[in-house]
């Protein structure tokens, strides 16, 4: 199940990167009050015709080993329990249990 979710998320990331500039351009045209309203409406229509998954709002950080969407470290892209297990085994370079 996690492979399916991770592959779906990966496809969304690729689509979002592909359409990022076009989406930002259309949004800027829509929000510009100096442009005529028909031109803004035309760009709003073009924005609505872009693929749904091309928005970064639909991208979700997921654990690369379990596919879990919550409590995932952005830097390592690992769920906190998996991170703890890998760190305690010494599988993550430079990570050790803190003590003071």
Swiss-Prot record:
One of its GO terms (biological process) is translation. Pfam families: Ribosomal_S14. It comes from Brassica napus. It is found in: Mitochondrion. SUPFAM superfamilies: Glucocorticoid receptor-like (DNA-binding domain). One of its GO terms (cellular component) is mitochondrion. The lineage of its organism: Eukaryota, Viridiplantae, Streptophyta, Embryophyta, Tracheophyta. GO terms for molecular function: structural constituent of ribosome. Keywords: Mitochondrion, Ribonucleoprotein, Ribosomal protein. This is Small ribosomal subunit protein uS14m. It comes from the Eukaryota. Belongs to the universal ribosomal protein uS14 family. Gene3D superfamilies: 1.10.287.1480.
């Amino acid at each position: 199940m996690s492979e399916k979710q991770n592959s779906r998320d990966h496809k969304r990331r690729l689509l979002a990167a592909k359409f990022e500039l076009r989406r930002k351009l259309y949004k800027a045209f829509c929000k510009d009050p100096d442009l005529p309203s028909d031109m803004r409406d035309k760009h709003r229509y073009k924005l609505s015709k872009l693929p749904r998954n091309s928005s970064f709002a639909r991208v979700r950080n997921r654990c690369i080993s379990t596919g879990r969407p919550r409590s995932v470290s952005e830097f390592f892209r690992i769920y906190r329990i998996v991170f703890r297990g890998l760190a305690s085994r010494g599988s993550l370079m430079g990570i050790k249990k803190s003590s003071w």
